[in-house]
């Protein structure tokens, strides 16, 4: 995995920023709303319906950024535990402990892959928000506090070595970028979510892993 590293003040990496927008720019990315899935709306082990954080039309976004970062022809949906009634941060937090990862993998977050032709379902906590995708250069010394897609692992992400070679990094989601619950869709407005996909996806209901970290 390529990582943003401190290799000199002029070292820059290209990422594609995700920013909520009032108009649809055809990016293929949506915060919230519903999605095309061939499965029931996912619930966590406590019986709580998960929040759909972001949906990606993979081919559209691949074309937008000019590289095959996501599985072509598919729809990627990222779900995470959310509750307005209880503290849920610990259910989706991972800092490199295998027990944390095992807990999340029980269903406290889900990464689903589907076909565009699958049924459209919307049981989400908040409505759809269009997302603008913009190319941006990031200094390798910086800690990017915004949402983006990229194959470059951002500085500040820790503990991902536990994932081994089975996954690859594709996106960072900054909770404060999503205008829902004062930016608290991931527990705190400064919580950062990280999305890794499996290099080989045999099960569309288990296409990757999504977790958060809080500094």
Regions found by a protein language model. Give the residues of each.
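Preference for intrinsically disordered or flexible, low-complexity segments
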Residues: 1-215
């Amino acid at each position: 995995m390529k990582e943003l590293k401190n290799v000199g003040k002029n070292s820059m990496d290209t990422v594609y920023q995700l920013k909520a927008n009032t108009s649809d720019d055809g990016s293929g990315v949506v915060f919230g709303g519903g999605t095309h899935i061939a499965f029931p709306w996912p619930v966590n082990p406590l019986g709580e319906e998960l929040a759909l954080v972001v949906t990606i039309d993979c081919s559209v976004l691949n074309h937008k950024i000019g590289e095959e970062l996501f599985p072509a022809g598919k729809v990627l949906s990222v779900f995470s535990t959310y509750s307005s009634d209880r503290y849920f941060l610990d259910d989706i937090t991972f800092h490199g402990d295998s027990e944390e990862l095992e807990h999340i993998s029980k269903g406290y977050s889900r990464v689903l892959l589907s076909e565009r032709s699958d049924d459209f379902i919307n049981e989400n906590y908040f409505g759809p928000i269009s997302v603008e995708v913009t190319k941006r250069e990031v200094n390798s010394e910086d800690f990017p506090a915004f949402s983006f897609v990229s194959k470059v692992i951002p500085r500040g992400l820790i503990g991902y070595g536990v994932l081994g070679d089975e996954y690859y990094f594709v996106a960072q989601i900054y909770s404060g970028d999503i205008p829902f619950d004062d930016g608290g869709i991931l527990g705190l407005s400064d919580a950062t979510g990280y999305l890794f996909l499996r290099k080989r996806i045999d099960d569309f209901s288990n296409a990757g892993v999504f977790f958060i970290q809080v500094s």
